[in-house]
Curated annotation (Swiss-Prot):
The keyword Oxidoreductase does not apply. PANTHER family: SERUM RESPONSE FACTOR HOMOLOG. Probable transcription factor. The lineage of its organism: Eukaryota, Viridiplantae, Streptophyta, Embryophyta, Tracheophyta. Preferentially expressed in roots. One of its GO terms (cellular component) is nucleus. The gene is AGL17. One of its GO terms (molecular function) is protein dimerization activity. SMART domains: MADS (SM00432). This is Agamous-like MADS-box protein AGL17. Residues 86-176 form the K-box domain. Keywords: DNA-binding, Nucleus, Transcription, Transcription regulation. It comes from Arabidopsis thaliana (Mouse-ear cress). It is found in: Nucleus.
């Protein structure tokens, strides 16, 4: 049979109460540790026994977690109060104005517009910042040039490959024409012919074939005229 439901109420027997407190306290601290590790949560646990003995656990530190808790509660209360909310956004606006002023002043110093009153150390810091910026610009420029060179090399190799492929096709077509010429006129006619002479012979043979094919039409035309 299953265990009966335990009634949650104060344990009267002091010995049983102490044993239960010890077991439940250890289990609670174990669960707090697991929650902090598994969920990357900031956990703080504070326990006082009925004898005023302190037990605590914190994933970071009890003090920092309590300070964070107090700050969060204070901000929450301020946001719930309209007047406090206005003050909050006023502080935010003032902070942003100060940051903007600092950025503008830094920009003027980096561009050399506002250098009066700066010490030697401050000028050296500005010089170091400019040198770092120049190094970054040079590195970016070199990277862009390297990428462009790689792309041009890739295109050159592609064109070279296409030229080789076209050259192979031309040679293959020439060989086919030579084979056709040999079949049509025999191998004896090709002996002793150079490359250009053989090409001329192939094209000349093609012209003769076209001429021979057109002669019957001319003969028929002449016969019709005589009749």
């Amino acid at each position: 049979m299953g265990r009966g439901k335990i009634v949650i109420q104060k344990i009267d027997d002091s010995t049983s109460r102490q044993v239960t407190f010890s077991k439940r306290r250890k289990g609670l601290i174990k669960k707090a540790k697991e929650l902090a590790i598994l969920c990357d949560a900031e956990v703080c646990l504070i326990i006082f026994s009925n004898t005023d003995k302190l037990y605590d656990f914190a994933s970071s530190s009890v003090k920092s977690t309590i300070e964070r808790f107090n700050t969060a509660k204070m901000e929450e209360q301020e946001l719930m109060n309209p007047a406090s909310e206005v003050k909050f956004w006023q502080r935010e606006a003032e902070t942003l104005r100060q940051e903007l002023h600092s950025l503008q002043e830094n920009y003027r110093q980096l561009t050399g517009v506002e250098l009066n009153g700066l010490s030697v150390k401050e000028l050296q810091n500005i010089e170091s910042q400019l040198e770092m910026s120049l190094r970054g610009i040079r590195m970016k420029r070199e990277q862009i040039l390297t990428n462009e060179i790689k792309e041009l090399t890739r295109k050159r190799n592609l064109v070279h490959h296409e030229n080789l492929e076209l050259s192979r096709k031309v040679q293959r077509i020439h060989q086919e024409n030579v084979e056709l010429y040999k079949k049509a006129y025999g191998t004896s006619n090709t002996n002793g012919l150079g490359h250009h002479e053989l090409v001329d012979a192939v094209y000349e043979s093609h012209a003769q074939v076209r001429l021979q094919l057109s002669q019957p039409e001319q003969s028929h035309y002449k016969t019709s005229s005589n009749s």
